[in-house]
């Protein structure tokens, strides 16, 4: 069964591809395989809105089942920021390091783990060319370190520590992170729908 991961981000593609391969025989593609495809601009205030818009658009344009996701980092002490600005927190043209630097600056006066609490919220949508979709949500709670640690991952990974873990997401191995992350939790909830699609395809072939 053909399925397209609606992302050009290497880490997201790897994590999702690893998960899909564990489920069954998917022919897996990503947006890097469709250089002429133009994704819609993210304008939603919630991960669910952006993931759904991306998924439905890509599924229709590429005539394929699609997996799309959107993730936001929320810091309650900052009234939910970065939130919908997670990808542009330090500006439209800023890089991940700039966003992390701004977050640390905004949290300078916050010292306790309670005050520095944060969580990632991820919504993943499985969408069909006909407009049918399934969605799942994953949350990972933790707190923001007072300095960057680790060189793996992307985004805010080098600042985020999951509760009960002593390493940031950027210090964890991909295998470990892929079991406990917000994206992993959302993907696991989608597993029954994906397996059902595979079973239906096998039946139709026979």
UniProtKB/Swiss-Prot annotation:
<dbReference type="GO" id="GO:0036222">
    <property type="term" value="F:XTP diphosphatase activity"/>
</dbReference>
<dbReference type="GO" id="GO:0017111">
    <property type="term" value="F:ribonucleoside triphosphate phosphatase activity"/>
</dbReference>
<dbReference type="GO" id="GO:0009146">
    <property type="term" value="P:purine nucleoside triphosphate catabolic process"/>
</dbReference>
<protein>
    <recommendedName>
        <fullName>dITP/XTP pyrophosphatase</fullName>
        <ecNumber>3.6.1.66</ecNumber>
    </recommendedName>
</protein>
<dbReference type="InterPro" id="IPR020922">
    <property type="entry name" value="dITP/XTP_pyrophosphatase"/>
</dbReference>
<dbReference type="GO" id="GO:0035870">
    <property type="term" value="F:dITP diphosphatase activity"/>
</dbReference>
<dbReference type="GO" id="GO:0009117">
    <property type="term" value="P:nucleotide metabolic process"/>
</dbReference>
<dbReference type="Pfam" id="PF01725">
    <property type="entry name" value="Ham1p_like"/>
</dbReference>
<keyword id="KW-0479">Metal-binding</keyword>
<feature type="binding site">
    <location>
        <position position="177"/>
    </location>
    <ligand>
        <name>substrate</name>
    </ligand>
</feature>
<comment type="subunit">
    <text>Homodimer.</text>
</comment>
<dbReference type="InterPro" id="IPR002637">
    <property type="entry name" value="RdgB/HAM1"/>
</dbReference>
<feature type="binding site">
    <location>
        <begin position="7"/>
        <end position="12"/>
    </location>
    <ligand>
        <name>substrate</name>
    </ligand>
</feature>
<keyword id="KW-0547">Nucleotide-binding</keyword>
<feature type="binding site">
    <location>
        <begin position="154"/>
        <end position="157"/>
    </location>
    <ligand>
        <name>substrate</name>
    </ligand>
</feature>
<dbReference type="GO" id="GO:0005829">
    <property type="term" value="C:cytosol"/>
</dbReference>
<dbReference type="GO" id="GO:0036220">
    <property type="term" value="F:ITP diphosphatase activity"/>
</dbReference>
<feature type="binding site">
    <location>
        <position position="70"/>
    </location>
    <ligand>
        <name>Mg(2+)</name>
    </ligand>
</feature>
<keyword id="KW-0460">Magnesium</keyword>
<comment type="function">
    <text>Pyrophosphatase that catalyzes the hydrolysis of nucleoside triphosphates to their monophosphate derivatives, with a high preference for the non-canonical purine nucleotides XTP (xanthosine triphosphate), dITP (deoxyinosine triphosphate) and ITP. Seems to function as a house-cleaning enzyme that removes non-canonical purine nucleotides from the nucleotide pool, thus preventing their incorporation into DNA/RNA and avoiding chromosomal lesions.</text>
</comment>
<feature type="binding site">
    <location>
        <begin position="182"/>
        <end position="183"/>
    </location>
    <ligand>
        <name>substrate</name>
    </ligand>
</feature>
<dbReference type="GO" id="GO:0046872">
    <property type="term" value="F:metal ion binding"/>
</dbReference>
<comment type="similarity">
    <text>Belongs to the HAM1 NTPase family.</text>
</comment>
<keyword id="KW-0378">Hydrolase</keyword>
<dbReference type="InterPro" id="IPR029001">
    <property type="entry name" value="ITPase-like_fam"/>
</dbReference>
<feature type="active site" description="Proton acceptor">
    <location>
        <position position="70"/>
    </location>
</feature>
<dbReference type="GO" id="GO:0000166">
    <property type="term" value="F:nucleotide binding"/>
</dbReference>
<feature type="binding site">
    <location>
        <position position="71"/>
    </location>
    <ligand>
        <name>substrate</name>
    </ligand>
</feature>
<keyword id="KW-0546">Nucleotide metabolism</keyword>
């Amino acid at each position: 069964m053909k399925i397209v991961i609606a992302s050009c981000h290497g880490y997201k593609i790897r994590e999702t591809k690893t998960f899909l391969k564990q489920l069954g025989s998917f022919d897996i593609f990503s947006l890097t395989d469709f250089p002429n495809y133009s994704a819609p601009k993210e304008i939603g205030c919630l991960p669910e809105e952006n993931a759904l818009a991306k998924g439905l658009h890509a599924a229709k344009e590429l005539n394929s089942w699609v997996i799309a996701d959107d993730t936001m980092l929320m810091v309650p002490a900052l009234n939910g920021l970065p939130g919908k600005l997670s990808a542009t927190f330090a500006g439209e043209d800023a890089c991940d390091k700039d966003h992390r630097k701004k977050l640390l600056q905004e949290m300078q006066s916050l010292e306790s783990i309670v005050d520095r609490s944060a969580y990632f919220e991820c919504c993943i949508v499985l969408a069909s060319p006909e407009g049918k979709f399934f969605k799942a949500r994953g949350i990972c709670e933790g707190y923001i370190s007072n300095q960057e640690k680790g060189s793996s991952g992307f985004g805010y990974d080098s600042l985020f520590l999951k509760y009960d873990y002593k390493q940031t997401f950027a210090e964890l191995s991909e295998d470990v992170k892929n079991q406990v992350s917000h994206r992993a939790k959302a993907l696991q909830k989608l597993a029954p729908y994906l397996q059902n699609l595979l079973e239906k395809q096998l039946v139709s072939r026979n």
